[in-house]
Amino acid sequence: PGTLRLDTPAGLVIAEYKQVGEHVEEVRITNVPSFLYAEGLTVECPVLGEISVDVAYGGNFYAIVDPQKNYRDMADHSANDLVAWSPVVRQRLNEKYSFAHPENPGINRLSHMLWTGAPTHPEADARNAVFYGDKAIDRSPCGTGTSARMAQLHAKGKLKEGDNFVHESIISSLFKGRVEKE
């Protein structure tokens, strides 16, 4: 086993890896502290109309879109739909609300969208599509996104310290997370 200490814009991230021969088989990452920042923020989304989002931090600020009246599940929409809507929704949220990390004033805007849905993989607890940048959907469940999602679920009493959480991506890849401490 080995350990890497990564100095990221969000803070120190520790990566512990298990190597077998010349290949790394498993990596465990201890992320920066994550937290639910805001609940129930409303915004107009193209095509869908008004939606409500929670905003959580897991290394970046995420607008998390859970099932609701105008949005049932990410499976109902194409990746192209999410790529088209996400920058508009993100911009509108940044114009309407303020986002500021309590310990790092340089982190002061919502940068990612996390669209949720029911898992399709038998081992997964939840599924997501993470939009970032100008027009990209992450193929992985996203480490900072998984941390933000877990912080949201923990704050709402759906995960507690020590609970495991398996997050599925838009292409069914999996990340395993655990609430380490409150």
Predicted regions, residues:
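Active-site proximal loop and beta-alpha junction motif in alpha/beta enzyme cores
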Residues: 1-144, 148-182
